[in-house]
């Protein structure tokens, strides 16, 4: 049995990469930090957090690991390094992929990570990637485990300094457009995840990553898939078509631009094939063409679920099969030779909207820490960061404004820290060129703000808002989400954002009434009492939410698109508030840790206790936050 130790690695990957999509197993959010030595200028904050993970968070079978010869008092970091080292020993002894896959399937089944059929389908999909990456001579257990988030991560290029071709010109604050200005409308849809074999009446709680299918058998009561969908499953084609029909009827030719930011396939990640992935893209492409192909300019972006297996994007030219397929599907819109070449090379491109305004579509899988291929090069995979700089510089030189669109927001744990920090530098350098950024991936409705020094020559100067990320809620209901889309109203002349309007349908009511009713859920300016969507106004929105419990609860409800979940879990705790406020203030993920400590210190500022008692209170707040993040915040991927 000792030979089975190596597949511990694959077990770790199953947990961390969200392969099993189990809500309690995504990301490490442990916040037990040394209160006295907090330095927010580097990775030390996050690494202290990771180092304090303990075995209570591992959810592993201790008896099994003791049989493997592993000390179960170790941290998740220790477990990960142990597994990596064992696999690398197995590779060095010339044992093959088939051996590792067999052992991984045995472990996956033995520990009930997934049902046997899921283990048998899922693990072989990842075996080649795992074997190949761990065969790199420079890849160590410590490095890989840091990369995936279980250990302190030290990127090979630790400076992360971007060299810009020209110095930054003096900042010119944006002038909000007049309310009477002519406008355009941008439709943003993301994370459709349509399941073409969804079947009403089937079991929605089947114990697999995706249910509501005929092989799952019939469900009973609330666990039966509804006619229009179920909160535990991906969306069905019937509901997707209803959404597109509503948009067409309500807005018609008023939609000028469509941002479509990826993730078309369902979450049946253990059953997927090259053909199924391509077919999923074609299915959604045909819908977008049907409703907007002749009336709007469409700008797609690639998601992490487009590849096979999920999250897996080898460095160029290793991902050419999916990039070429998408290039074919998107040929009505991405049809300039130079940009077709960029798309086929790295999954990114840029195109003009009109004179003075362009879109840069990013492949955010080059920052995805679920993409193990980036262990080989996480500094600037596919040269996309340098390409972004070159493209933005060209736009700045001619006074052109830019929208950034992509799938994975850079301020969440799924984006590699060092890469995220580099993008932060780029956005702040070109803040007067970039109008806003638009992402999806989390399935939730959220926004975050970039900040920079008010005087960039003075590191002690106060911070000011420089740009904004808008994360649009998903079309899919997976998980606990009402189907949603967003309409931005923008100034026709300048492209400046004026309003953000989010629409959804109540899935429970759709199933009850026999048809969905699509409604405006909220307008951002009215809900958060701000005049417009400039970075300064969105920073004001954060201040308003921070000072108003009712506004915070509104944000909480909108975060889940007014699904039943927030009604059962109101945002009344310090932890809930801390999490939301710091997400809003963290367009780069390491800023989240900085924000947490800043907010907690402010909270304790007026306490009359001595320092030791304050330190104890702070630790308790951080422990409560850690528990909240691991047990109450729903994750999607």
UniProtKB/Swiss-Prot annotation:
A single MF term (Gene Ontology): hydrolase activity, acting on glycosyl bonds
Gene Ontology biological-process entries: ceramide biosynthetic process; sphingomyelin catabolic process
Binding positions (Zn(2+) 1): 191, 193, 263, 443
Subcellular location: Secreted
Signal peptide start-end: 1-20
Keywords from the UniProt entry: Disulfide bond, Glycoprotein, Glycosidase, Hydrolase, Metal-binding, Secreted, Signal, Zinc
Keyword rRNA-binding set for record: no
Protein's name according to its UniProt entry: Sphingomyelin phosphodiesterase B
Cofactor, free-text remark: Binds 2 Zn(2+) per subunit.
Domain Saposin B-type per the UniProt entry, residue ranges: 73-155
Record-level GO cellular component terms: extracellular space; membrane
First-tier enzyme category under EC: hydrolase
EC code: 3.1.4.-
InterPro entries referenced in this protein's UniProt entry, alphabetically: ASM_C, ASMase/PPN1_MPP, Calcineurin-like_PHP_ApaH, Metallo-depent_PP-like, SapB_1, Saposin-like, SaposinB_dom, Sphingomy_PDE
One Pfam family matching this protein: ASMase_C
Organism taxonomic ancestry: Eukaryota, Amoebozoa, Evosea, Eumycetozoa, Dictyostelia
Organism encoding this protein: Dictyostelium discoideum (Social amoeba)
Cystine pairings recorded for this chain: 77-151, 80-145, 108-119, 212-233, 582-595
Cofactor: Zn(2+)
General function of this protein: Converts sphingomyelin to ceramide.
